[in-house]
């Protein structure tokens, strides 16, 4: 999943959710980029990268990103939990 926002003339801010990580970064037209990342678990549980995403993308887009990351987090947890005995 990816979100991208044009900031200024040639600069873009992006968020990718892939491979168990949330990645927040920026790039320009020459594809020079910088990024920081955290695990999906740290994003949901510890709140890492949440505030910068809200600041760059706004509350509405942040909620969309958060909901999708939370869904991935929940699916990952379902796959790793042991079956319940009845």
Curated annotation (Swiss-Prot):
Protein name: Uncharacterized protein DDB_G0288141
Organism, as annotated: Dictyostelium discoideum (Social amoeba)
Lineage: superkingdom: Eukaryota
């Amino acid at each position: 999943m990816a979100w991208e926002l044009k900031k200024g003339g040639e600069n873009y801010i992006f968020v990718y959710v892939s491979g168990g990580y949330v990645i927040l970064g920026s790039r320009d037209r020459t594809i020079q980029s910088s990024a920081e990342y955290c695990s999906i678990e740290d994003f949901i549980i510890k709140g890492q990268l949440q505030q910068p995403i809200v600041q760059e993308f706004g509350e509405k887009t942040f909620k969309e990103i958060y909901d999708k990351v939370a869904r991935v987090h929940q699916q990952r947890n379902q796959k790793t939990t042991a079956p319940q005995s009845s």
